[in-house]
From Swiss-Prot:
It catalyses: Exonucleolytic cleavage in either 5'- to 3'- or 3'- to 5'-direction to yield nucleoside 5'-phosphates. GO terms for molecular function: exodeoxyribonuclease VII activity. This is Exodeoxyribonuclease 7 small subunit. Its main location: cytoplasm. It is an enzyme of class 3 (hydrolase). GO terms for cellular component: cytosol; exodeoxyribonuclease VII complex. Bidirectionally degrades single-stranded DNA into large acid-insoluble oligonucleotides, which are then degraded further into small acid-soluble oligonucleotides. The keyword Protein transport does not apply. Heterooligomer composed of large and small subunits. InterPro entries: Exonuc_VII_S, Exonuc_VII_ssu_sf. Its EC number is 3.1.11.6. One of its GO terms (biological process) is DNA catabolic process. The keyword Hydrolase applies.
Length: 83
């Protein structure tokens, strides 16, 4: 995994970032990567994890639920976890 050939983490979709993160975890678990390379891909994995968390947070912030009045009629929307 050469950092020069890799796309910028922020340019990856959630699915692309998760897929690359899974490859990194697999390589580290196998233990057949040199120490310097392990550190390099671990750091990339940390960046991918943070990117995925940010994308998930943004998606959660966009999800809303319909608020109903006492008669059950739609009254507006509110954040999904507001109660």
């Amino acid at each position: 995994m050469n950092n020069n050939a890799q796309p910028d983490v922020s340019a990856l979709s959630f699915e692309q970032a998760v897929e690359e993160l899974e490859r990194i975890v697999s390589a580290l678990e196998r233990g057949d990567v040199a120490l310097d390379k392990s550190i390099e891909i671990y750091e990339r994995g940390e960046a991918l994890k943070k990117h995925c968390e940010a994308l998930l947070k943004a998606a959660e912030d966009r999800i809303e639920k319909i608020r109903l009045d006492r008669a059950g009629r739609p009254q507006g929307v509110e954040p999904l976890d507001a109660e």
